[in-house]
A protein has these predicted regions:
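Short hydrophobic-aromatic micro-motifs
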Residues: 45-47
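Long, amphipathic alpha-helical surface segments
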Residues: 1-34, 41, 50, 54, ...
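Active-site nucleophile-His-acid catalytic modules used for acyl/amide transfer and hydrolysis
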Residues: 76-114
Length: 169
């Protein structure tokens, strides 16, 4: 059974980057307007997981955080995914959004060399969705938050697999 909330997200009419930011990246990353030290990643972080050029003491408004995220999603993640996965634009938007969020979280190099990317190149959409769930570990251990993000989410947030599968016929 397809998720009603994921179908609702897909029916919102948002473009790829806005859909990804609104329903996946921001809910899972959260928004911190003031830079903080990410002890796991060992890097200064701000907004919705932004690390590029962030320094201690940086502060951004909510509007600036959203603008920065959408710019990064488009330029640093969407465009590279289009280059490394020739069939990216042929995939349903639900798969594109899930892969874009995965790439933002794990990096384009890992996303482009993943089994999910391989399945997308084969146009095996259901297998691509399921392959994204493999990225649920940090430090060699399954992390409950990553497991939920990759799969069916939680009470407040849509998971990548949940959205991914909702767009398949």
């Amino acid at each position: 059974m397809k998720s009603k909330r994921a179908k609702g997200a897909l029916a919102s009419g948002l473009g790829l980057v806005a859909l990804t930011a609104t329903y996946l990246t921001v809910p899972w990353e959260g928004v911190e307007n003031k830079a903080y030290w990410d002890s796991l990643g060992k890097v200064w972080t701000v907004c919705a997981g932004e690390t590029k050029g962030v320094k201690k003491g940086d502060y951004y408004s909510d509007a600036k955080c959203l603008q920065m995220l959408q710019t990064r999603l488009e330029n640093d993640f969407h465009k590279p995914l289009q280059k490394c996965i020739a069939t990216f634009d042929a995939a349903p938007i639900s798969i594109q959004a899930s892969m874009l969020d995965l790439s933002y979280n794990i990096g384009t190099g890992a996303a482009c060399s993943s089994s999910a990317a391989k399945r997308m190149r084969e146009k095996n959409w259901p297998a691509a969705c399921n392959a994204m769930t493999l990225f649920n570990r940090a430090g060699g251990r399954v992390v409950e938050g990553l497991k939920k993000r990759r799969e069916y989410g939680d009470a407040q947030r849509i998971g990548e697999l949940e959205l991914c599968l909702a767009g398949l016929k």
